[in-house]
């Protein structure tokens, strides 16, 4: 087994803010500021990855901005723009039995409770009311669907999720 810990993407470095090396952050966490709960951060741009220390942060007009140790001017900060923000997978909290991280659902096959293969989860969307599975249909889909949007409503639509089998069973009409 590798001694490298598995990394997950928490967000992305947006633009430079000001002239003193501050950076705008695009957080992929539910609450924007929750990205600050996970450390250490590694910034990955292309094939280069570096661990960084956040020395300060602020919220500015609903945008999170951070100060990285050793980055003290606009030019140094510009070199980090576009970097993915990574942390160790082990930093994520354990979830209850019926909760899953989106990253665990993406790539799973989706089948109906009658055995019809609807396709593979390619993305997730947050709608406010509930999350939605974006399912890319199989090439030979009998209903000529290319993509399906299936609400992630546990026990109403989602009957079961098997991490081991990488499969989600749904109560869903394949023609819809």
Curated annotation (Swiss-Prot):
Domain of life from the UniProt record: Bacteria
Single GO biological process annotation from the record: ribosomal small subunit biogenesis
Domain annotation PRC barrel: ranges: 97-176
Keyword annotations: Chaperone, Cytoplasm, Ribosome biogenesis, rRNA processing
One example GO MF annotation: ribosome binding
Keyword 4Fe-4S recorded: no
Family that this chain belongs to: Belongs to the RimM family.
Family annotation (PANTHER family): RIBOSOME MATURATION FACTOR RIMM
Purpose: An accessory protein needed during the final step in the assembly of 30S ribosomal subunit, possibly for assembly of the head region. Essential for efficient processing of 16S rRNA. May be needed both before and after RbfA during the maturation of 16S rRNA. It has affinity for free ribosomal 30S subunits but not for 70S ribosomes.
Protein name: Ribosome maturation factor RimM
């Amino acid at each position: 087994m590798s001694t490298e810990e598995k990394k997950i993407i928490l967000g992305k470095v947006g633009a430079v803010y000001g002239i003193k090396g501050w950076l705008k952050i695009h957080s992929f966490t539910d609450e924007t500021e929750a990205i600050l709960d996970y450390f250490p951060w590694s910034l990955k741009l292309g094939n280069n990855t570096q661990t960084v220390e956040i020395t300060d942060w602020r919220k500015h007009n609903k945008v999170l901005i951070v100060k990285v140790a050793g980055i003290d001017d606009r030019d140094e900060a510009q070199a980090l723009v576009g970097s993915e923000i990574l942390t160790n997978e082990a930093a994520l909290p354990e979830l209850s039995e019926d909760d899953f991280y989106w990253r665990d659902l993406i790539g799973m096959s989706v089948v109906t409770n009658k055995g019809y293969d609807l396709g593979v989860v390619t993305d997730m969307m947050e709608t406010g009311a509930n999350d939605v599975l974006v399912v890319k249909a199989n090439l030979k889909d009998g209903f000529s669907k290319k993509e399906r949007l299936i609400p992630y409503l546990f026990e109403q639509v989602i009957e079961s999720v098997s991490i081991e089998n990488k499969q989600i069973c749904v109560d869903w009409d394949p023609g819809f």
